[in-house]
Amino acid sequence: MTKIVIWAQSVCRSTMDLYREVKRLRDDVGVTVVLRRDGRGEDVRKLREAQGQGDYSDVVDRVWDGKFESGVELLDLGAVHVFSGYQVNHAVRELMVEAKRRALRVVEYDEAPCEMCVGVKGVLKRLYYAMILPMMVRRAVEAADLFISASGNMGMDRLVRLGWKREAIVPFGYTSGGFGEWGTGNGELEMGRGLRVLHTGVEAKYRGVDVLKRAAASLKRRGVELEVKFTGGKVDAAQLPRLYEWADVVVACGLCEPWGMRVNDVLLEGIPVVVSDGMGAAMLCDEFGCGCVVPKGDANALAAVLERCANDRGFLAHLRSGAKMAAAEIAPEKRAKVWLGKVLGE
């Protein structure tokens, strides 16, 4: 039996739903999930549980305090180790090096560097990514056999600048079980009403909400009928399926986001999306034809896509069909098979 150890950085549905399915997948593969519970990890756990994401106690097998000395003892649990958090955790980086010294297979499942800050903080963060982080992670990167990118196709050049070989980078993204019944979608666009456009989550600058507002204002000035709903912040998980059912299309126009879990949630409901190329989740639109990708920050391009959705019902029906197909393909059960195959080098 091949034994795999997954070093989980925090309790989050974006990874825990995947790990649960990986553990169930094959009789010839044994999986141990180790959860980091140092100070930061515990804070993240409490936040996730407050958001209704659960404690995933059925997924986690071991708890790790985030220290190198105690982590070394866990290296004996498997021949394949999937780490995460190498950018921010020194102990993880040292464990990657030690695992390679022991001739174990080392995989890093993580995001590409992505700068969501603005102003002076953003400038400093970019300098950190360019000048300091590459030196910090060099030995860990050299120790790894594979990098599975939770950012999909986004940020490949940034990963290469950190020292990753392009051929060792596998685009993947995140996955989740969603919140409602999969693939239900909205019905046909009703006569006598405009296009219903939904934007969920916080209205932070990095999410590009101003881009959608400018696009909507432009369309209304030109007489295009549409209704745009902004949730204006985080929404209780129980309310999300009803919101998705209301929408004809959901817009996620982030300027710089490593992935964007709301895109997964929307597609699992069978609702098409319009995603900016500043988000890793744009990969799903390219792969499944379940929506449109627009240049980040481009209100005119976003307006053009929404206008076509409003006026061309055949086009919108095509996107809906793609969304319903994607609902089955991006579910954790399906994605777990792909992920595990990459981890094992199959």
What are these regions (language model features)?
Residues E287-F288, C292-A299, R308-R313:
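Conserved acidic donor-binding segment of nucleotide-sugar-dependent glycosyltransferases
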Residues R126-I148, D157:
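Membrane-proximal helix-turn-helix segments that form the acceptor-binding/catalytic region
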Residues P241, N264-L268, A282-M283:
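Short alpha-helical segment that forms part of, or immediately flanks, the ligand-binding pocket
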Residues G314-L344:
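A charged, aromatic-enriched C-terminal amphipathic alpha-helix characteristic of glycosyltransferases
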Residues E190-R207, K213-A216:
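Conserved donor-binding/catalytic core segment of Leloir-type glycosyltransferases
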Residues L255:
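Aromatic "clamp/platform" in nucleotide-sugar-dependent glycosyltransferases that forms part
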Residues R242-A247:
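Short alpha-helical donor nucleotide-sugar binding micro-motif in glycosyltransferases
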Residues P272-V275:
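Short hydrophobic beta-strand element within catalytic cores of glycosyltransferases
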